[in-house]
Amino acid sequence: MKKEASELLGFSPQKDIVYNELLPYKDKLDDESNEILAQIKGNLGRAVQLREVWPGVLFWTRKLSTYIRLYGRKFNKEDHVLFVKLLYELVTIPKLEISMMQSFARLLITLLKKKELLSREDLELPWRPLYELQDRILYSKTEHLGLNWFPSSVEAVLKVLIKSCRPYFPESATQEMLDEWKPLMCPFDVTMQKAMGYFELFLPTTLPPELHDKGFKLWFDDLISLWVSVQNLPSWEVNLVSLFARLANDNIGYIDWDPYIPKIFTRILRSLNLPVGSSQMLVSRYLTNAYDISYVVIWISALLGGPSKQAQTQLSGLFNGITSFFHPSNHGRWLMKLMKLLQRLPASVVKRLHRERYRTPTWLTPIPESHLLSEQDITDFVESIKQPVLLAMFSKTGSLDAAQALQNLALLRPELVIPPVLEKTYPAMETLIEPHQLTATLSCMIGVARSLVAGGQRFPEGPKHMLPLLMRALPGVDPNDFSKCMITFQFLATFVTLVPLVDCSSAIHSRNGLTQVEKELCSASAEFEHFVLQFVDRCFALIDTSTLEQTREEMEMEKMTHLESLVELGLSSTFSTILTQCSMEIFQVALDKVFNFATTSIFETHVAGRMVADMCRATTKCHPAEALKLFLPHCCSAILQIAANEEVLNEEELDKELMWNLQLLSEVVRVDGDQLLLYRSQLVQILQLTLHLKCKQGYSLACKLLYHILRSMSLIYPREYCSIPGGIQQHTDTYLPIQDWGRPGELWNLEIQWHVPSTEETEFVFYLLDLLLKPELQRLQKHTEGQQDISRDDVLQSLSIVHNCFLGASSLLPPLHGEPVPQLINGMVQLYETKVYTGVDYDMSRENYREDICKVIRPLLNHTLEHSEDDIKSLFSIIKIINDLLHFKGSHKNEFDTRWKSFNLIKKSMENRLHGSKQHIRALLIDRVMLQHELRNLTMEGCSYRSVHQDLINDLLRLSTSRYSQVRCRAQNVLFTALGTYNFCCRDIIPVVLKYLDPERTDVTQQQFKGALYCLLGNHSGICLANLQYWDCIALTWPALVRSGMSPSMSLEKTSIVRLFDDLADKIHRQYETISVNFSIPESCVEIAVKMLKSSSPEPNPGAASEQEELEGRKREEQKNKDAMQKYEKLVADLLDCLHDRNIPWKFEQLTIGFLSLMLRDDLPLPSSAVLFFVESLNHDSLLVRNVAISAVAGILKQLKRPHKKVAVSPYDISELKTSLQSPVVSLLTGDRPDNQWLQYDSSRLPRSQRDWDECCFIEKTHWGYSTWPRKLMLYAPLEEQPKQGQTREEMNEREQIIYDHFSDQLFIDQFIQYLSLEDRKGKDKFSPRRFCLFKGLFRNFDDAFLPLLKPHMERLVADSHESPQRCVAEIISGLIRGSKHWSYSKVEKLWALLCPLLRKALSNITIETYIDWGTCIATACESRDPRKLHWLFEMLMESPVTGEGGSFVDACRLYVLQGGLAQQEWRVPELLHRLLQYLEPKLTQVYKNVRERIGSVLTYIFMIDVDLPYTQPTTSPRIREFTERVLARLKPLTEGEEEIQNHIVEENMEGDQDERTQAIKLLKTVLKWLMTSAGRSFSSSVPEQLRLLPLLFKIAPVENDDSYDEMKTDAKTCLSLMSQGLLYSDQIPQVLSALEEISRSSSWHARYTILTYLQIMVFYNLFTFLSDAKAVCDVRALVLRLLEDEQLEVREMAATTLSGFLQCNFLSIDEPMQAHFESLSKTRLPKRKRRELGSVVDTIPSADLVRRHAGVLGLSACILSSPYDVPTWMPQILMDLSAHLNDTQPIEMTVKKTLSDFRRTHHDNWQEHKQKFTDDQLLVLTDLLVSPCYYA
């Protein structure tokens, strides 16, 4: 196959689309594709060589995309590599416009998508250009200032692009990336997220084994140990998981994951966020940063297999632990994740198995033998996931996930999964009361259908279920239950498609050597006929009940309801599938039955009639000759008989019988055209008779008949979709149909029977057109010319005939021709349309009716608009005709899209992902070939725009602005489609649309005005004319939109018009992307283009450009860039002109300002006239305008920023660093090292003089130096090399002068500050980053020039305690501090002399409304700044924050502000943190709750830096351990006492010092706040320290949930809940357990009770870490069993609950010793009861014996409750043991009753199944127990 192809083509294609080979005109395709490819290579190469990015390069890259869509990668490897390299160069052009970049990127992704086609030897791509692109866009420094507008989709496109290029990065890339990004790894900083994001995206993982040393081995140990040591799920952990999953999947067998497997599974389990225990608090970040399931499944499936089998053990453990969550009765927000896990995991394993066993080997490294999945591995996997999947079938989220999982599992092990599904399906088919069970089981059966029917050696008995399933499914065709009906149709269709319905029962006698199974199947196949007939009866019943009630309104009559149309579709497609698969004998019987049904009664034509007609159509389509013989003569004679009566033709309401026969006829002719030729005379007779009926319904049906006849004759389509080539045959001696059950189609043996129009058919089509279409066209023409007056109804009838004639025959009519419209654009590269051959050779000698219709319709439209504009129905019809004249060649785009979607759905529901290689069923493959034909038919992009299109589009525009909104709306939709089809026609149409908006014109109606605006707005999918991304276009549309505000047709009273302008503004702002002013192409691109022009096979056509042309190209490139600049400046000038017009309404002023703000860019400064306008607008009286102006001026200031010189320094040359680098080991570590100590804040070495300041080496970015130093550190050059500070006005440029003059003007500033200190939205205002940017820019660009004017304002505002003035001054101050980054020392010193008093004052005036703003102010001021530059600020903030002055609230606020500043500084201020801690420690006993909470939060930040990460030095910041020691010493009074701690402190300051105990309780409250806040924030929990506080917490935490408890108790409870969820390392487990062990001996039963709840959560959230430590499991078990015998009843009961939970998640197992232990306990003898005296007290204290007996009973009931959904082998006996205790004393009796009632509740659903597990005697006892009187007692 391949060889022939390459000889014909002249090269061997990389990978073409095979379906093209099966088209009926395949012989013409090679020449066609070669010609197109040669054009693409030639023109794309030339476009790059001539430097014409637009339109040349863009146009021809789009052509390449289309080429790939039509032919696949049908080019040789050399071309493939050249295309990739060229596009890579294009994508990475530095100044390229984003929309073009995306367009190239998408094509490059397509070219790289099949990575097996190009190996690393063929292609190498550099990584750095992509990194620079990603960095420029994702971390843009100018986007937030509005200097760059990126589309929202760009991030996703870049990600996929990098993914596609990753396999081809050079081998040195990994090391280079690590050097680049490792210095960013500072875990407290946002740069950590950046580094991890880059690692995840860029690190290559597909290097061959010999290069692993240059690949993952460089980073794996570092990153995995980092991952292992992080405990609290920071946001970047997700990136690591994704990276590890990819690494594992790409290198199966080359990495030893075993040491990490328990940790991996523990974290996966934690990440599911399942609820455990009753009082669990979830940490919110666990939800937001949870792992993405799609990575988790890749990781798991890559870990399976291999020698150790450990992953499978853990996976089984995982599913055992979570199975019960899948039970349908459980529901919560975690369910979606669980379902996704179930659905994706089998798919992922199938994918892996396909790669191991079936995929053609590629250059990618194969999996080593040792790690391939063995048969046993697969079985184990399926066994482990089977139970949850079966439970999930009935889940609340629907059965879809389970069905997909089962489909994949059935491919692996049909014998394990299909039987249990069948067990659930058969009863579901019988039940009447639970229809949802039927829907669920059927959808799962559909998934496993192919595995079931194919049988195979694993599951030979599969096919036997086929017939019973089909027969039992029939009752599902139920008119009363819509969803049941639909799923039944789907089920029947799926199964029948796989099986030829042939009765082979006689083969048993006539053939020898059949196996037992084959014999059974043969005899069963006798049922097929019965099945088909029963199905037909069911359908009849369905139709009878759905006959249309006559009560519907006339309008609704037109359409069936949505549900009805779905049922109709389901019915007709299922019926046609069944008939297609029938043998001729069965078909004949069904045909007679349908024919009788259809012809013996008369149906109304709307619902029932349509369904019956559909069934008849299906029968005729299957075997046209046999069926037409019956139907056609019958219908024709019936119609002729009734219509013989002349009066009938003019009746308004037609005879029902006539209508029904006409409807039936119009459907049954939808068959192969050649079959219809036999009946041509009858058909013509009927058409002539009925096309001119008076009744609209009548002639519509006649038109439909005509349309169907023409289509059948003129289109290319497959004749049959049977599952076996050559149709269904009877069995013979050599052939047995049974063997074809479930057989996939063979791609190279499809034998598609095509219908291709014969000469005879074409003749007949044109005969019909001449006979029927021509007279109508003449009639309409006469009407237009005024020679013959026709009524509106007749016009409509004529149009209807014209339209249907055209729709039916359009594929034979050549497209419209005409002269191309000249001068829309001028490029040097040719742009021509691609002609795609679709099997039709147009006969040019015949009349081209497409042209004729066009010539008649245009004058008719004109006539109608002038004389009868209200004839809406005719206009509708004309719009449809114009649409089809332009585009229609036999298939509609939307129908094609729907078919493509449904094809994909069916493919997914029935595909075999394990074997791959297109093993679909035959019908599906034929469908795909047909879709390929239609795709070619619809390929329209890049058509030349000709004069005839221009005329029609102008007509559409006229209709789009007509008087009636319905007409406008329809015409606009057609117009938008047309605009997207023809090259550059928008440029032609925009001026025409804008004429309607011209303010000079007085003749434009409001409707026209609105229509024109809608034309500019566009629809949601198509083009938006108002915002085409070209300077020439927006230079026209934007000013016109603004000026239209002065048009007489514009009225702001009309809400619809106001809304339109809002929508337009909104759409433009949403969609605008910065348009480039630089269209240059670099040399590197041109070199590759020249190579491409020299390549061969096929030779590029046209060839390379001459030198002359190249020079011309360069000249044009320069000119184009110049033009762009001019157009940009002109547009800004035009918009400003509009604004200076006094008459412009306010709405339009705002619109214009919005447009102007989009004109800010980072590569060109804004023209000074616009700068002046924006600066003046800062004091505009409209808030909206002021806000836009603030943003704009901030952006302008960024444009005017003079670049500060930076020098690259090797970090090790910095004087401070040199001295500290003695030991070499240190440099490998991160954290506080000698070589980064000089960066830290040290009050003894602060730059307090000019000299110190100049000598100090400032490093502003906080993360530098924490991890490794970068190779080259960029530092600011010394002051004398920087731009001059304090420029005089003369030294400034014009833009700077404008700003300088305004901000030096006292009045301007007064007004500006007054506006800023107003309230915008009451109570909703926040600190505004925009205003901060504005002030930062002012002080950065102009130093302290404006301070003198602002100073009095700041002093006034600080003194005003109202919210808005405070916020305003906070914004100014933060901008001032950040703006002073490069000021000279003297200026900075003066600044702080001014600021410190202001800030002191502000902090003493702080209020509840403003403290957050001040926090933001200080945090913003300190972000990314060297702390040594801000020492004045820190020293000022550290002056006794908690003084009590101004009350507790002010204290809390001051702390908050201080925390904001210190948190930004992270690890660089250890000294300040120590000072703060020292200062706070004595104050931890604060009385006020708000101060306590704040101190708790501050402590979290103080200790944030104390992390336990790998390769990290111990921190010099405060450490938790030392702090905990000191705190514990102060809590002594509480830890020593035994009694429970009550909070008896009244919150008020009592004089004098209270006793130690009271102080300790206050301290404890603050410590609790600290523990709570740090739970979710820090990276690692300090477990050993927390453990020492545990005993105390257990003492306080209450047992019951009660809101009336005080704060301390609830806090303790929260802390315990949060701590129990913490991630534990394996070495911490013994510590925790010994702590718990100790507390369990405490005298307080509250503590003992709480231990159990703590234990439940802790074990579940660290399940696999515990399980991998056998001693720990024993200890936990012993602890629980001991507490089961606790003297306190509540503790015993809790221990039982805990035990049952542990058993349920398989942490503990029910073994012999445990069962024996409980049984012996439960048999403890109780002392005999003596006759008690009434009221004696002795008996209330439980004796030790009673406790032991109760413990035994509790243990037994725990066992029973641990398996709520099934009955294990040990359960019946335990139930019997329990029942013996029903009459024991309390509390035993209660326990037994409760257990029995729970058992009954949980096992009730599937009792039929569960009953099997008990013996008859046991059942008797049980039934007795469960319904005996004691149950009600």
Curated annotation (Swiss-Prot):
Gene Ontology CC: one annotated term: nucleus
UniProtKB keywords: Cytoplasm, DNA damage, DNA repair, Nucleus, Proteasome, Repeat
An example molecular function term from Gene Ontology annotations: peptidase activator activity
Subcellular location: Cytoplasm, Cytosol; Nucleus; Nucleus speckle
GO BP annotation list: DNA damage response; DNA repair; proteasomal ubiquitin-independent protein catabolic process; sperm DNA condensation
Residue span of region Disordered: 1095-1122
Residue stretches of biased makeup (Basic and acidic residues): 1111-1122
Gene3D superfamilies on file: Leucine-rich Repeat Variant
SUPFAM superfamilies associated with the record: ARM repeat
InterPro entries membership: ARM-like, ARM-type_fold, Blm10_mid, HEAT_PSME4, PSME4, PSME4_C
Region (Bromodomain-like (BRDL)): 1640-1728
Domain notes: The bromodomain-like (BRDL) region specifically recognizes and binds acetylated histones.
Similarity comment text for this entry: Belongs to the BLM10 family.
Task performed by this protein: Associated component of the proteasome that specifically recognizes acetylated histones and promotes ATP- and ubiquitin-independent degradation of core histones during DNA damage response. Recognizes and binds acetylated histones via its bromodomain-like (BRDL) region and activates the proteasome by opening the gated channel for substrate entry. Binds to the core proteasome via its C-terminus, which occupies the same binding sites as the proteasomal ATPases, opening the closed structure of the proteasome via an active gating mechanism.
Quaternary data: Homodimer. Interacts with the 20S and 26S proteasomes.
Protein name (record): Proteasome activator complex subunit 4A
Origin species: Danio rerio
